[in-house]
């Protein structure tokens, strides 16, 4: 994947402003609410019976933070995302058996959360760079499925 200097700058500069705790918990919560079939991968998280329960669930928040923190690795390794996610791809494919389409859904949720948090700073050019990044990450996570 080729990244222009502008794309790299847009991604990295926005990432420095991201509150990983807040955005991560919100992103995973939204995924579980908007796409309820994804909840089956998180049955050990306890109460996921309503949007209120999901948004208040400390395990959802903690795992969301973990997911967003992992996403930060992509930001740091834009030129080597496939290798960065090799072990996570293997885990999600061979052990967790996650439908790889869910990675695209989570990527879409990431975009929504970033847009909600950054408003006018999340310009169309910034969105395009981030959209590219979430697609590259989703593809890297799905790599072991092929």
Swiss-Prot record:
SUPFAM superfamilies per the UniProt record, alphabetical: Globin-like
GO BP terms in the entry: hydrogen peroxide catabolic process
Annotated ranges, domain Globin: 2-146
Keyword Glycoprotein: no
Example of a GO cellular component annotation carried by this entry: hemoglobin complex
Keywords on record: Heme, Iron, Metal-binding, Oxygen transport, Transport
PROSITE patterns tied to this protein: GLOBIN
Domain of life: Eukaryota
Protein role: Involved in oxygen transport from the lung to the various peripheral tissues.
Family: Belongs to the globin family.
Known partners and oligomeric status: There are three forms of hemoglobin in Sphenodon: A, A' and D. Hb A is a tetramer of two alpha-A and two beta-1, Hb A' is a tetramer of two alpha-a and two beta-2, Hb D is a tetramer of two alpha-D and two beta-2.
Other remarks in the entry: Sphenodon Hbs have properties not found in other reptiles: poor cooperativity, high affinity for oxygen, small Bohr and haldane effects, appreciable phosphate effects (those properties are also found in the Hbs of primitive urodele and caecilian amphibians).
Protein name: Hemoglobin subunit beta-2
Organism: Sphenodon punctatus (Tuatara)
């Amino acid at each position: 994947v080729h990244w222009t200097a502008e794309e790299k700058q847009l991604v990295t500069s926005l990432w420095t402003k991201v509150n990983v705790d807040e955005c991560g918990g919100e992103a995973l919560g939204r995924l579980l609410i908007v796409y309820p079939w994804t909840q089956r991968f998180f049955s050990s998280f306890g109460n996921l019976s309503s949007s209120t329960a999901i948004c208040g669930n400390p395990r959802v928040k903690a795992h969301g933070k973990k997911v967003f923190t992992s996403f930060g690795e992509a930001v740091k390794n834009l030129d080597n995302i496939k290798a960065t996610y090799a072990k996570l791809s293997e885990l999600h494919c061979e052990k967790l058996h996650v439908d790889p389409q869910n990675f695209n859904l989570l990527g879409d949720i990431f975009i929504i959360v970033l847009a909600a948090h950054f408003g006018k700073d999340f310009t169309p050019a910034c969105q395009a760079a981030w959209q590219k990044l979430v697609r590259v990450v989703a593809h890297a996570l799905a790599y072991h499925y092929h």
